[in-house]
Amino acid sequence: MKGIFIGLIEGYRRFISPLFPPSCRFQPTCSQYAMEAIDRFGVLRGSWLAIKRILRCHPFHPGGYDPVPPCHHKHD
């Protein structure tokens, strides 16, 4: 399932994104962030993180460096 979502984002990056001028306010870009978040946390949590990030990507937000949070494994 992860591969499908990451493939869709890669398709967007390859075929749709080049049609528009760069506008992401963040580093890494929102699409890079989404791919890394889904890869690290899975489809549900990774997509949720990506959606929250995309909602912050607007002209009134300063943007800047905003990496995917680290994965914290619980140790018993």
From Swiss-Prot:
It is found in: Cell inner membrane. Pfam families: YidD. SMART domains: Haemolytic (SM01234). The lineage of its organism: Bacteria, Bacillati, Cyanobacteriota, Cyanophyceae, Oscillatoriophycideae. GO terms for cellular component: plasma membrane. This is Putative membrane protein insertion efficiency factor. Belongs to the UPF0161 family. It comes from Microcystis aeruginosa (strain NIES-843 / IAM M-2473). It is a peripheral membrane protein. NCBIfam families: membrane protein insertion efficiency factor YidD. PANTHER family: MEMBRANE PROTEIN INSERTION EFFICIENCY FACTOR-RELATED. Could be involved in insertion of integral membrane proteins into the membrane. Coiled coil: none annotated. Keywords: Cell inner membrane, Cell membrane, Membrane.
